[in-house]
Amino acid sequence: MKVYSSVRKICKSCGLIRRHGKLFVRCINSKHNQRQN
């Protein structure tokens, strides 16, 4: 999982999730997993 100041969807299977006040992008492709700091 990479940490970015701005997260975005990369492909169609990416989904935005808000958890504990942080924004996450979860995807089938593990390279697309992101977290906002």
Swiss-Prot record:
- Keywords of the record: Plastid, Ribonucleoprotein, Ribosomal protein
- GO biological process per UniProt: translation
Compartments it resides in: Plastid
In terms of InterPro entries, this protein maps to: Ribosomal_bL36, Ribosomal_bL36_sp
Q: What is an example of a GO molecular function annotated in this UniProt entry? A: structural constituent of ribosome
Pfam families of this UniProt entry?
Answer: Ribosomal_L36
What GO cellular component entries does it have? Answer: plastid; ribonucleoprotein complex; ribosome
UniProt family annotation: Belongs to the bacterial ribosomal protein bL36 family.
Q: What is this protein called?
A: Large ribosomal subunit protein bL36c
From what organism does this protein derive? Euglena longa
Give the organism's phylogenetic lineage.
Eukaryota, Discoba, Euglenozoa, Euglenida, Spirocuta
